[in-house]
């Protein structure tokens, strides 16, 4: 996953 990416937001 790219930096700053969050599936939970």
UniProtKB/Swiss-Prot annotation:
Cysteine pairings via disulfide bonds: none
Keywords: Amphibian defense peptide, G-protein coupled receptor impairing toxin, Secreted, Toxin, Vasoactive, Vasodilator
Protein name listed in UniProt: [Ala1,Thr6]-bradykinin
Biological process annotations from GO: defense response; vasodilation
Record bears the keyword Secreted: yes
GO molecular function terms noted in the UniProt entry: toxin activity
GO CC terms of this entry: extracellular region
Purpose of the protein: Produces in vitro relaxation of rat arterial smooth muscle and constriction of intestinal smooth muscle. May target bradykinin receptors (BDKRB).
Lineage: Eukaryota, Metazoa, Chordata, Craniata, Vertebrata
Tissue expression notes: Expressed by the skin glands.
Protein family: Belongs to the bradykinin-related peptide family.
Membrane-traversing stretches: none
């Amino acid at each position: 996953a790219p930096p700053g990416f969050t599936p939970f937001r």
